């Protein structure tokens, strides 16, 4: 009893006791709202609170690493289930944690009436002024201007650079197209002082839009080359838009003034329509008529470039670790990964530890555009560097770190981000449109052309992929299983053999053993050095997958001049006026403006003999099993149905 008393809870005083709830009243209160009703009420309250709190944005700004389904739903102020439902009807099975690519985000956002802007679009177009830090300002010196040469294909950009460098390098380029960006530095006399200019040569073909955009990212002035005998062309307009997006001054080089039909004034007039008004017409745009072939006015053009960039106050700090941009990169069979680097701040030295995007490197050797080995390269200097662990991506910024440990830490984070981006891209490449499939269900299975793409440099890979995106995809899909710079390897051949793919190489070679493997497995390997031919052949291959179509092929015409009744049937006596008539061909019988018969020609006779055909200028008798109502003056149109290769339609 003592133990029991010690453990018992003491009774509360009466003043502190609570009144016991009435059990029946509580039961009646619970019965008023069921579980389902309570859940529905809470959902409505949450939805109302969300709608009151969040307003759908006027514009959706997407970060560079894209968005998950849940993040997109939050930014659009909608339920994630709405996004998943929208994706399902587009043939994409997604979860709330799945990362969406940019194209998918744009499509979904447009359904909800919200336009999309990628966060890095504006940033990528502008010069990388962030290369200069606050600590650099006490050590700044003048640096050489970086000049981008832009314009329409075949307007003479490479020839102009050739004239500037006094070296004949332009003649050997396939199809007149510069296949990847080159960087060159020249030294000129300006006011009795040696001054330098660094030139970036961006390819002129419209397929290389991405490379031109990278060129303007690092440039201080754009030289717009326009042929005096051709005028403003589509790529000219594109180059103007890139230069304006980069907010860099434009100097126009009106090239080929030596050619017959050259009209610099016509070029100025066409450019004025694009709000580029020449100085001698009262505007502020420097326009210099030049002849790259004859070397006319090249010195004047260089002078103008220096004058235009003097007001820009271009500076950099050479006494710091280097920073800059990867202009181009490729895999060399003997040297390994090779990158063309433009130093924008600091000084790059042999032995420096470099991080370029997710790629780590230690500079083993550097050469300039004349293949001279260098120990260091200062601001605005372009070099070809060896020593990267893998091929960096053209357009990535690079930075030198004091030691390998700190560089590895940065590269590791970037590599994780790059892997996530690749996974998102792979998910996008596997998408199949349910709408497209249902629309083609009656015409057979969806056709695909599998490709493996290898090219000399990353810039070429991007350009070709961009061009493939422009091909019609309504009936045949192009699926790129692998795209990378470098030579064609046995692994590529194995992948092609397993997937039924064609290997397309652009300015690249085959590794040892790859050709033998391709021959043994029957894999088709195509190599090209001109992008036009590559795209043309791929389009022909896509058309080869289409079912041929039946089309009419005209044979001839005849005129009915007499009608002979034989029992229940009739025979028309005809005169062949053009072409020929063939037995068992198709005919249309025209009577005035009407077609009274459209079908087979069953009998064809000449002088009571059955014949296979009757040529122009001869008489014959014709008959059909399904038509006997012939009349004098009827016109017979003869034709046959033939199969024809179909063309892709946009």
UniProtKB/Swiss-Prot annotation:
Coiled coil: none annotated. Residues 151-158 are annotated as: G1. Residues 176-180 are annotated as: G2. One of its GO terms (cellular component) is cytosol. Keywords: Cytoplasm, GTP-binding, Initiation factor, Nucleotide-binding, Protein biosynthesis. Residues 291-293 are annotated as: G5. Residues 201-204 are annotated as: G3. It is found in: Cytoplasm. InterPro entries: EF-G-like_DII, IF2_II, IF2_N, P-loop_NTPase, Small_GTP-bd, T_Tr_GTP-bd_dom, TF_IF2_bacterial-like, TIF_IF2. One of its GO terms (molecular function) is GTP binding. Residues 11-20, 27-40 have a biased composition (Basic residues). Gene3D superfamilies: P-loop containing nucleotide triphosphate hydrolases, Translation factors, Translation initiation factor IF- 2, domain 3. Its main location: cytoplasm. Residues 1-40 are annotated as: Disordered. Residues 255-258 are annotated as: G4. GTP binds at residues 151-158, 201-205, 255-258. Residues 142-314 form the tr-type G domain. One of the essential components for the initiation of protein synthesis. Protects formylmethionyl-tRNA from spontaneous hydrolysis and promotes its binding to the 30S ribosomal subunits. Also involved in the hydrolysis of GTP during the formation of the 70S ribosomal complex. Belongs to the TRAFAC class translation factor GTPase superfamily. Classic translation factor GTPase family. IF-2 subfamily. HAMAP family: IF_2_B (MF_00100_B). NCBIfam families: IF-2 (TIGR00487), small_GTP (TIGR00231). This is Translation initiation factor IF-2. The lineage of its organism: Bacteria, Bacillati, Cyanobacteriota, Cyanophyceae, Synechococcales. The gene is infB.
């Amino acid at each position: 009893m003592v133990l029991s008393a010690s453990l018992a809870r003491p009774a509360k005083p009466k003043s502190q006791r609570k009144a016991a709830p009435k059990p029946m009243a509580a039961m009646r209160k619970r019965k008023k709202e069921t579980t389902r009703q309570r859940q529905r009420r809470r959902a409505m309250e949450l939805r109302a609170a969300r709608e009151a709190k969040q307003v759908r944005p006027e514009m959706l700004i997407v970060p560079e690493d894209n968005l998950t389904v849940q993040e997109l739903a939050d930014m659009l102020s909608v339920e994630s289930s709405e996004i998943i439902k929208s994706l399902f009807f587009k043939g994409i099975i997604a979860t709330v944690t799945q990362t969406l690519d940019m194209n998918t985000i744009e499509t979904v956002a447009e359904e909800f009436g919200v336009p999309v802007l990628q966060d890095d679009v504006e940033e990528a177009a502008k010069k990388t002024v962030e290369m200069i830090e606050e600590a650099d300002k006490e050590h700044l010196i003048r640096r050489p201007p970086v000049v981008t040469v832009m314009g329409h294909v075949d307007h003479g950009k490479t020839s102009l650079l050739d004239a500037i460098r006094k070296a004949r390098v332009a003649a050997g380029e396939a199809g007149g197209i510069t296949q990847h960006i080159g960087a060159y530095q020249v030294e000129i006399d300006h006011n009795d002082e040696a001054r330098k200019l660094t030139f970036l040569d961006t390819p002129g073909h419209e397929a290389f839009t991405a490379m031109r955009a990278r060129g303007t990212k690092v440039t201080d002035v754009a030289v717009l080359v326009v042929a005096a005998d051709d005028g403003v062309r589509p790529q000219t307009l594109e180059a103007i838009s890139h230069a304006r997006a980069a907010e860099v001054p434009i100097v126009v080089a009106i090239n080929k003034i030596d050619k017959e039909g050259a009209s610099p004034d016509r070029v100025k007039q066409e450019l004025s329509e694009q709000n580029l008004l020449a100085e001698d017409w009262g505007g502020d745009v420097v326009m210099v008529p030049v002849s790259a072939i004859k070397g006319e006015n090249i010195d004047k053009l260089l002078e103008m470039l220096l004058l235009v960039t003097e007001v820009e106050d271009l500076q950099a700090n050479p006494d710091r670790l280097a920073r800059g941009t990867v202009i181009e990169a490729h895999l060399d069979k003997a040297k390994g990964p090779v990158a063309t680097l433009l130093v924008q701040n600091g000084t790059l030295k042999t032995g420096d530890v470099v991080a370029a995007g997710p790629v780590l490197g230690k500079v083993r050797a550097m050469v300039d555009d004349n293949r001279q080995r260098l120990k260091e390269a200062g601001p605005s200097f372009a070099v070809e560097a060896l020593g990267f662990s893998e091929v960096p991506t053209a357009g990535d910024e690079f930075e030198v770190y004091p030691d390998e440990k700190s560089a590895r830490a940065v590269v590791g984070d970037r590599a994780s981000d790059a892997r996530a981006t690749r996974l998102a891209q792979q998910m996008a490449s596997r998408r199949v449109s349910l709408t497209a499939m249902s629309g083609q269900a009656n015409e057979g299975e969806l056709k695909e052309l599998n490709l493996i793409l290898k090219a000399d440099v990353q810039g070429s890979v991007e350009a070709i992929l961009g061009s493939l995106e422009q091909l019609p995809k309504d009936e045949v899909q192009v699926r790129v299983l692998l795209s990378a710079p470098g030579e064609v390897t046995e692994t590529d051949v194995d992948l092609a053999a397993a997937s039924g793919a064609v290997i397309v190489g652009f300015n690249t070679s085959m590794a040892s053993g790859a050709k033998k493997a391709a021959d043994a497995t029957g894999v088709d390997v195509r190599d090209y050095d001109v992008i036009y031919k590559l795209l043309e052949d791929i389009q022909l291959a896509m058309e080869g997958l289409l079912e041929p179509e039946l089309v009419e092929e005209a044979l001839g015409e005849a005129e009915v001049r007499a009608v002979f009744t034989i029992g229940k049937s009739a025979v028309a006596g005809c005169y062949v006026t053009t072409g020929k008539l063939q037995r068992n061909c198709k005919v249309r019988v025209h009577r005035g403006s009407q077609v009274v018969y459209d079908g087979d020609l069953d009998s064809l006779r000449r002088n009571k003999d059955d014949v296979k055909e009757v040529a122009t200028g001869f008489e014959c008798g014709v008959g059909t099993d399904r038509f006997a109502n012939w009349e004098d003056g009827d016109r017979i149109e003869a034709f046959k149905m033939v199969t024809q290769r179909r063309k892709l339609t946009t």
